[in-house]
């Protein structure tokens, strides 16, 4: 008789995982069945030193235990009914996004400095805590800060703006400063345990590319940079999909020298970043406190743009 997959509740229940192997897996950030099932055998082997064939068996067993298999289109339709949305605070912006920021996907906000990327991330970290009938998910947020842009004072203002207790709101935002690209990747690996065991509904990475660009400059380092960035983005995609959370990443822009007409700016990160997010939103400055948002890539949304405002109390529609 084979081992009943329903008996596998923890990584220590997986066939071939004794105390030593379990310790290696946990030290590498693979602390849950979901984290192992979402990884490739190569990733597990490289991170732990476990032989590739053993890693293959462990990953296969984790996937079988979680019943990762083919689904019908009807199954996907039923699953889509579980997708939730977080209000941005601006009705205009919500309508552009089809109702708000979706769970089970990555939303990328890209634009130049001062275009509103970090402001929206702060607002979402507050709004995710609202009741569902007010556009929230009654959940907590994780804020991975790579550039030191997080401000608790701004959270305080925004919390007051939506009628929530600022101190209670701040207690429900887990902030961490990522010091380099490998630390950033390790943080996301750890989130597979955090998200499973806590009521986390939003993960923010602000910004997703800055460390990778700084640490791997030049064309000679491009392949390594893109490989690491690809792994990082796929972990975020798996996190969003497995746990039904919203993932929001910010990104910088650069000018394309080959564009002579129209807007020459594009998001950094190349094709790797271009394929990962489910929704890509380009933000631009306008007059005063107004900003322009344009959906540039989303399979379920039409391309379009709208105007929102950054006010004392947060993201709002312009007056």
Swiss-Prot record:
Organism lineage: Archaea, Thermoproteota, Thermoprotei, Desulfurococcales, Desulfurococcaceae
Q: Which InterPro entries match?
A: AAA+_ATPase, DNA_recomb/repair_Rad51_C, DNA_recomb/repair_RadA, DNA_recomb/repair_RecA-like, DNA_repair_Rad51/TF_NusA_a-hlx, P-loop_NTPase, RecA_ATP-bd, RecA_monomer-monomer_interface
Keyword annotations for this protein? ATP-binding, DNA damage, DNA recombination, DNA-binding, Nucleotide-binding
Described function: Involved in DNA repair and in homologous recombination. Binds and assemble on single-stranded DNA to form a nucleoprotein filament. Hydrolyzes ATP in a ssDNA-dependent manner and promotes DNA strand exchange between homologous DNA molecules.
Which organism is this entry from?
Aeropyrum pernix
What is the protein's name according to its record?
A: DNA repair and recombination protein RadA
Which Gene Ontology MF annotations are present? ATP binding; ATP hydrolysis activity; ATP-dependent DNA damage sensor activity; damaged DNA binding
- DNA-binding in keyword set: yes
Record: residues binding ATP: 111-118
Q: Which NCBIfam families match?
A: PRK04301.1, recomb_radA
Changing residue 286 to G has the effect of: In strain: TB1
Write down a Pfam family by its short name: Rad51
Biological processes annotated in GO: DNA recombination; DNA repair
Q: Which Gene3D superfamilies match?
A: 5' to 3' exonuclease, C-terminal subdomain (1.10.150.20), P-loop containing nucleotide triphosphate hydrolases (3.40.50.300)
Q: What is the effect of changing residue 201 to R?
A: In strain: OH2
Q: Which family does it belong to?
A: Belongs to the eukaryotic RecA-like protein family.
Which HAMAP family has this protein been placed in? RadA_arch
